[in-house]
């Protein structure tokens, strides 16, 4: 009895896919180069990928520089988080197709660990911290707590007075403490080469200065001169302005020729309504 055996042939591949390849050479090349290939050498990572579209096939080569950087433990743990969406199959770290690195933004802390506020002084370029109590800003010229010595509006006046005092001391040193023919000490103001002066004659003009606060932002020097000129002769008007924006800070100093005029200006203009604000006029504090 004869026995016949039938062998089952393997199924034919999809003809549509074969016709799309075009040739067996391209099919072999596609199997060989299919998917991305990565190679790392001397800290340089090269990723080669083949992209096909209607216009043809393109070979994309991306080069990365591998840098080993030590980071804190929380940062390293965040990089291991599971990705989602279109990036769920990507490896750890940023991917060029979905992530790009923007410019670095530095964080500036305005308080230290003790909770004290830190201020940055642009003119001196030093950083200091304030304490929780007491006044921080202080001027060594006019003794005011509103500004620093470097930005004092009366610094030139005080410097001139200091130069005059230094010249008078040098002159007194040359003349000597005694008068010829006498063994007694004579005060500098009682000597023959200098006229006798009183304390009122050497009174500084800053004592004739009043401080004006709660000023409107659009108020200028001419408007203040016109307002305070109704009381007396105004020698100087200084409006404090911000050094970065050049906008008024809301206060000014007005210097009169006589102290009585300053007192009259305080009595008349304290509480005066200018635009939509009420002015506060007071003596400049000298301590």
UniProtKB/Swiss-Prot annotation:
GO biological process, one term: formation of cytoplasmic translation initiation complex
Tree of life domain: Eukaryota
Region (Disordered): 163-207
Main localization of the protein described in the UniProt heading: cytoplasm
GO molecular function: RNA binding; translation initiation factor activity
InterPro entries xref list: eIF3_g, eIF3g_N, eIF3G_RRM, Nucleotide-bd_a/b_plait_sf, RBD_domain_sf, RRM_dom
Domain RRM: from-to ranges: 208-286
SUPFAM superfamilies: RNA-binding domain, RBD
Primary role: RNA-binding component of the eukaryotic translation initiation factor 3 (eIF-3) complex, which is involved in protein synthesis of a specialized repertoire of mRNAs and, together with other initiation factors, stimulates binding of mRNA and methionyl-tRNAi to the 40S ribosome. The eIF-3 complex specifically targets and initiates translation of a subset of mRNAs involved in cell proliferation. This subunit can bind 18S rRNA.
Subunit-level organization: Component of the eukaryotic translation initiation factor 3 (eIF-3) complex.
Family named by the database record: Belongs to the eIF-3 subunit G family.
The protein, known as: Eukaryotic translation initiation factor 3 subunit G
Organism of derivation: Brugia malayi (Filarial nematode worm)
Lineage: Eukaryota, Metazoa, Ecdysozoa, Nematoda, Chromadorea
């Amino acid at each position: 009895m004869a026995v016949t055996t039938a062998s089952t042939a393997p199924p034919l591949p999809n003809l549509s896919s074969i016709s799309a390849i075009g040739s067996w050479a391209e099919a072999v090349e596609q199997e060989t180069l299919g998917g991305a290939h990565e190679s790392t050498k001397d800290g340089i990572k090269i990723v080669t990928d083949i992209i096909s579209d209607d216009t043809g096939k393109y070979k994309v080569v991306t080069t990365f520089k591998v840098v080993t950087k030590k980071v804190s433990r929380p940062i390293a743990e965040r990089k291991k988080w599971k990705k989602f969406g279109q990036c769920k199959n990507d490896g750890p770290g940023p991917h060029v197709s979905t992530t790009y690195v923007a410019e670095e933004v530095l964080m500036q802390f305005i308080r230290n660990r003790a909770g004290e506020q830190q201020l940055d002084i642009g003119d001196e370029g030093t950083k200091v911290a304030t304490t929780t109590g007491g006044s921080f800003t202080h001027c060594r010229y006019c003794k005011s707590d509103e500004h620093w010595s470097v930005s004092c509006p009366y610094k030139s006046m005080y410097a001139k007075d200091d130069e005059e005092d230094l010249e008078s001391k040098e002159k007194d040193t040359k003349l000597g403490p005694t008068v010829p023919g006498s063994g007694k000490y004579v005060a500098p103001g009682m000597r023959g080469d200098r006229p006798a002066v009183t304390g009122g004659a050497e009174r500084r003009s800053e004592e004739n200065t009043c401080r004006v606060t709660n000023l409107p932002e659009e108020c200028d020097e001419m408007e203040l001169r016109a307002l305070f000129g109704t009381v007396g002769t105004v020698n100087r008007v200084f409006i404090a302005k911000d050094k970065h924006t050049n906008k008024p800070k809301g206060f000014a100093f007005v210097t009169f020729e006589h102290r009585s005029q300053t007192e009259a200006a305080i009595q008349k203009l304290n509480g005066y309504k200018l635009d939509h604000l009420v002015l506060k006029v007071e003596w400049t504090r000298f301590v």
